[in-house]
């Protein structure tokens, strides 16, 4: 797939605005689906996301990065916390967060007892000392996946 042409196509179809810079694959990205660089306007994308989740999810990530891109060049709020960003992202149907591609093998599986959020860690944590970051509930070790 020609990434640059695909990003230009998504920009025209979903935003009706032209993408005038370059888009690149970046194999070093681990936890993020893509990045926007305001200094020179280029976009980086994680090829592992495309391979793991397919074109539909990848298109939503492209939309997310294009929201940053277009809002920046319109002089509007382009950061995640800005209202303009949240509204345009919702309007075009982009992903707010990248789905996780890390495998839980060889990790400890913790779960919050209140909100049932799952956490995977390589190192064991002291359950008396740490709480859930989302709701402050107590954590419990479900199983060691080693």
Swiss-Prot record:
Where is the protein found, in the record's own terms? Cytoplasm
> Where's the active site on this chain?
65
Q: Which Pfam families does its entry note?
A: SprT-like
Keywords, alphabetical: Cytoplasm, Metal-binding, Zinc
The cofactor(s) it depends on are: Zn(2+)
Q: Where is the signal peptide?
A: none
Task: Recite the UniProt cofactor note for this protein.
Answer: Binds 1 zinc ion.
- A Gene Ontology molecular-function term? zinc ion binding
Where does it primarily localize? cytoplasm
Q: Which InterPro entries match?
A: SprT-like_domain, Uncharacterised_SprT-like
Q: Which SMART domains match?
A: SprT (SM00731)
Which residues of the sequence carry a binding annotation for Zn(2+)? 64, 68
- Assigned GO CC terms: cytoplasm
Q: What Gene Ontology biological process does one annotation of this record name?
A: response to stress
Q: Does the keyword Ribonucleoprotein apply?
A: no
The SprT-like domain extends over: 4-142
Can you tell me which family this protein belongs to? Belongs to the SprT family.
Quote the protein name from its UniProt record: Protein SprT-like
What species was this sequence derived from?
Streptococcus gordonii (strain Challis / ATCC 35105 / BCRC 15272 / CH1 / DL1 / V288)
